[in-house]
């Protein structure tokens, strides 16, 4: 019963191609040897690699030797007819001679012919029929046992039903080969008998053999039987069988079947030569094997499920590029999957027409990857790629910047920068980009792939676009013009370069890199702030000692005009002294502050205002002597000009930056003042050597050698209260300069170097500063500490004569003659031309006098700045007029010294401040007079 069931299953599946088998003759086994060598070299072994269940094919378990003998037969997957099982079946049917079945009647033969033609089930299109035709099974140890059992059952049945058939079978057993002994004729149910057990046995007894005979002997027997069949008038039976219509297929196969007649048509053809029609069959086999190469052998897939439309794609891939490994991987499918057990299929939105046009295009070799030039920035275009695919929508960009589509070369990782490597498909993950709207619209038939520089999954981080605007968006435009909590009211006219630069840098954010964007944002903020300081609004907020106040009620016009006239009086380009201003400066402190902070510059060159806050205690002293204070003089002698504020004030009056890459983060390496060094009164540097008067530098440098040996010159600066108002060269709270320093500030012939900055604005007891050498690290434009820390400014303008001297020797102003609500103040100023230096001290809280002692007095530094903080008056300043030549503004001790360029016709020498001197050098004109 087991054999009968197996034969019945084979009968239902096996006869699958004989309806058209008479049109195309099949070759014998010898010509298929060459096909086996060429086709199976793709698989690299003799064992079966595509073993499918037996019900997919048309042969049973006992046919395995026959299939190995036949080799790779033609598998026609287009019309769904498989001829594999009928190649050997035709020979076995012809070997069952017609003389053995002469008892069969003509109606039976005609019914058998029609049943045979109807019993050919149409197999499924695709690779299933292909695999069933090229299967190579390994040898089964139970083949001999099954053959003997089938022989005994078929012999006993045939002896009862068909007399004389068993002797003929036994006679033929001497002539059959081992391959034909395994052939199992598909049994067909009998129409006359209802037994399900007898019919398979009756069909089996036609092909079961026991003994094995050589190939040559079997061929001679076949030729004899074919000749004998022709003599008995098989042509008449063939004509009758073709004219009959389709009836039922429940008819047993007889010796007069069409398979026998098909074999008789090939009698004159030698066994060693294939027929002419075999060339087309070999080409089809090559096409099918090549499709298996792309589907199975190289990609390592296990279960393969393909559609019917994939057959045309698989066949067309052979002509595309058969010898290339990379083209072979991706030839038969658009999307490649790796790994075992995965299903291979195309996306749902891609049909057969799209794939066919894809592979027939001129750029079939560049379907998956479009390399671009290594040095080009523009995306590569294929002939059939539309220009609209890479043209961006400029309306979405805030700057109207054209965005181009990214080529795979633009998506390379940092490790594989500008590598034109072909994408590899060895890792088992889907390495294709997600199809978007452009891919689905089929306007672009090529889908870009992400390249990889190795066989690892390093293409995952390449999904990001290199445009960093997605990662770091620009600042909101509303908060762009705010600085330390105070709104910056800059001029927003289109002609203003500051506003245009700020708008470009902040609102759009169209920078190349993040560093340049940050630099331009800082630059724009500082420019807006400086522009706001030069053109302030009524409601500008300034904070002083953590207290905000509004200066909208301060009259600005009169104070600016008066101060400008005072400044113009001091220099040759101004009117003579006799034409000095007659009216006094308003006595409101806010007016003086407004004029000092926001006085507009008359020209494009540097015209800063220098602010010095002093703490003199008004007291008259007839002897003109100054007694030093032992408690404060040594602790405050190292305090000097705030270097950062001088550079900030210089930046306010100079031109904009020419290079956008210059940083404003306060680094000393990249200075943004290079393009505007002409506007600087003296060269700003950190290690300065006076090249013109080296002797004077040597005299000053000896004083600080001992201090440099004490500690490191780069002590961390921790005092954040030293940054004063922006437009000030120097501001020292609760201390003052001597006459020499005041003369240099007025003549504008001094340079800036690294100076100590323990200024401690607003503190009642400033800390003891370190030596000068310990605090000479400069932090120019330290944006972290740019604050509006303004003190209560009391202004005082000193007398400056026409010869360029610092002060008049005998200029004395008595405060008792003025309307001044404080203690009488008497200031005696002498010149430094004779080498004098100035010391400050106070004997009590009510009097103070300035004296210029001789240089013979032993001091540690060329100048020291003592602090008098025990008394500070907050009364309003007073203005007076002295001798009609100059105007002196007296206040609570703070002095305002306006500075401008030297008089016209006078060539000042830029005398820089050394790192270790701490004081400006003496001008050659001043030292030559006395």
From Swiss-Prot:
Record's compositionally biased regions (Polar residues): 377-399, 413-424
GO cellular component: cytoplasm; nucleus; plasma membrane
Membrane topology: Peripheral membrane protein
Organism from which the protein derives: Danio rerio
Subcellular location as annotated: Cytoplasm; Cell membrane; Nucleus
GO molecular function terms noted in the UniProt entry: beta-catenin binding; phosphatidylinositol-4,5-bisphosphate binding
Protein name: APC membrane recruitment protein 1
Described function: Regulator of the canonical Wnt signaling pathway. Acts by specifically binding phosphatidylinositol 4,5-bisphosphate (PtdIns(4,5)P2), translocating to the cell membrane and interacting with key regulators of the canonical Wnt signaling pathway, such as components of the beta-catenin destruction complex. Acts both as a positive and negative regulator of the Wnt signaling pathway, depending on the context.
Pfam (any one): AMER
Protein's UniProt keywords contain Cell membrane: yes
Biological process terms in GO annotation: negative regulation of canonical Wnt signaling pathway; negative regulation of Wnt signaling pathway; positive regulation of canonical Wnt signaling pathway; regulation of canonical Wnt signaling pathway; Wnt signaling pathway
UniProt keyword terms in alphabetical order: Cell membrane, Cytoplasm, Lipid-binding, Membrane, Nucleus, Wnt signaling pathway
Region Disordered: start-end pairs: 1-33, 55-76, 104-133, 161-193, 222-245, 366-454
Protein family according to the UniProt entry: Belongs to the Amer family.
Record's compositionally biased regions (Basic and acidic residues): 222-242, 439-452
